[in-house]
Amino acid sequence: VRLSPLSPAGYCPLHREEARLGIEAFPDDFLTSADAAIRYLRGRYLPDTVYYVCGTESLKNQLRLAGLRVAETLRDDCAVVLLGYDTELTYEKLESCCILLNRGADYVATHPDLVCPTWYGSAPDCGSVIEMLHTATGRRPKVIGKPQPEMALLAMEQTGFSPRETCLIGDRVYTDIACGVNAGIDTIFVLSGEGVMDDIEKYGVQPTYCMQNIREVLNTLEKGEPK
């Protein structure tokens, strides 16, 4: 199962990229932070709760399909601000978030990743907007995605694997590896992405294993190591 902070529109490119690399994957193999957020919101709030979503139309549609009430624009009855990865971000959306947060609305974010990797380097992700809104309002959200354990727990629930049978592989200590640690499962920190070895000490999160890349992970599994 691939744990992605992106909405369905975002993980389709990931699906295509894996296919290009010869990795067989299907859309159902991806579990997003939006999936975990929907589960959390359904369990915490009443069915008639109105949400103001600062996110893409794809995210809003996913919430609507799950039966949640999403406001089209800023409304007085919006009880919860949900912040997600938003490639359609506008100043009007930020202002609406500030208005609701200053009024005391509940505040939830799908994930805390500061940047999103792109072909030209890094671009702001949900975590960067979290910091911007914190500067403006002093508020911090309840974060649902990694590093919280919900996504890993949901993946195990859907696949039927136990914690002893599960390992989380990722390139970010502060989200991926922390999620696995918080869920009580083994982790593999790969150094072929954003993270570097110094991040282990920086964030105080210890992975079970460290490997250079996914190829080393596959070679290790083929050899039957590590024990």
Regions found by a protein language model. Name each.
Residues 4-6:
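Conserved phosphate-coupling serine/threonine residues in phosphotransfer and NTP-handling enzymes
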Residues 8-31, 38-227:
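Asp-based, Mg2+/Mn2+-dependent phosphohydrolase catalytic module
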